[in-house]
Amino acid sequence: MLLISRIGARHIRKKPLHVENHYRSFTKFDSFGNSPIPASKQRFVPTSGTYPKGFLVGSTNVGIKPDGLSQPDLILVASEKKWETCGAAVLTKNEFPAASVVVTRDLLKKSKGRGLRGVVANSWCANLLTGEKGLEDSRNMSREAGRIVSGEGTGQGEESVMVMHTGMGGQRLRIDNIIQGFPNLQQEMGTTHDHWIEAARGICTTDTFPKLASRTFTLPSSPETTFSIAGITKGAGMIHPNMATTLGIICTDAPITPPALQQLLSTAADKSYNCISIEGDTSTNDMVAMLANGAAAPNNAHFPVDFDSSAESQSEDFIAFQRMLIEFMADLAKLVVRDGEGATKFITIRVRGAPTYPAGKHIASVIARSVLFKTGVYGKDPNPIGVLAALGYSLMGTEFAGKGIINPESTSVSFMPVDGTDELNFVKKGRLVKVDEVRAKKLMEEEDVEVIVDLRDDGRKWREDDEEAVYWTCDITHEFVTINGDFGN
């Protein structure tokens, strides 16, 4: 999350707000590194994993975080020198991008992904609105990390590392601390689960738990070969992506061409990170980067995963990897929503029956930003009228307006219980229906809430291969307001 000091807020506060200790992480600047992971979140933190070959991960504390915090605040993820590696990234579309976004965008434009071997990131300072000096700090951070990645070399190696910042805006990076900390960071590089989990901790700000996922997969062209993918991510507030909200670093040992990697990442981001929202604010620092080194490729075969932009159909490997990557990145993105500031509910919104995926996704995103709906869910009220209200205005002023996409007489709204029983209808073809209040109450007591909006309820049973737009969000609580309003003592 990125915060800019709000001068004067403390002068109008009559009394300090109460914030539970495990949320006093970034607003109070003094406890994230010293606070335990809340019991309700511990199940989301893996105790082991399967990590891609040929990647080294390291983290260290260089003093960007306040005194007394020992958690890492500088991390580096890099492919070993012997592997031919490429990179890709999706970046925020916010008109006030942080220096890291500008520098990484320039690297991608210059390299077209070829030769990109690593990602360096820091927490606690967003390096936002810091002018040309801030840009030079980001460039220096990238160059110094590049020297480590290339084995203290020069030239291309110095322009091989993408850079990320997260934290407070309006402050200069402690670039001297960072550069002086690189030798220790290099010594801390390794391949174990502990290395990965510490790197995930190193990019946390208001997060209450580190976010890490990994899995193995195969490709149709070499079903006997097992590939791996791993990713770390962060975020708990200022979440409504348009990349491209959050930071994410993903690595795979599958062999992929640079243009294919960028296409795969962009498509997957559109159906994962770009489908989450907490409060509807798009960050200035959003970035998800991906590296592929082919280290697990059979017989040293390089780059079998490719695509032809002019082809009507892609290769089987491309299609299989795309499907896997969408699922994997969705898992990472959902961890961000699980950690939404003050959240008590994880909400899935499914929109069915839209003529196109973009139209359905837009509708789902509007519902996900509805304060009335989200506060209603916090109060354990399904609030179907709130869903319909958001649905009704969702297309106003958009390219989808006036095309008959929403027809009240064919629109139904239901909630899907987590126990696998039949969905519970609240609206049927534009009319409220009588519901089983006992069942409805039980449904809203659950942590996970799933809403289904069917724009073309024609009685046909929904099939799994039918396309739908899915969005993930959380409730808005008293705690959320308190956390973001706590600028007192």
Swiss-Prot record:
It is found in: Mitochondrion matrix. GO terms for biological process: L-arginine biosynthetic process; ornithine biosynthetic process. It catalyses: N(2)-acetyl-L-ornithine + L-glutamate = N-acetyl-L-glutamate + L-ornithine; L-glutamate + acetyl-CoA = N-acetyl-L-glutamate + CoA + H(+). The keyword Ion transport does not apply. Its main location: mitochondrion. One of its GO terms (molecular function) is glutamate N-acetyltransferase activity. Pfam families: ArgJ (PF01960). The active site is at T245 (nucleophile). The alpha and beta chains are autoproteolytically processed from a single precursor protein within the mitochondrion. Belongs to the ArgJ family. Catalyzes two activities which are involved in the cyclic version of arginine biosynthesis: the synthesis of acetylglutamate from glutamate and acetyl-CoA, and of ornithine by transacetylation between acetylornithine and glutamate. Heterodimer of an alpha and a beta chain. This is Arginine biosynthesis bifunctional protein ArgJ 2, mitochondrial. It comes from Sclerotinia sclerotiorum (strain ATCC 18683 / 1980 / Ss-1).
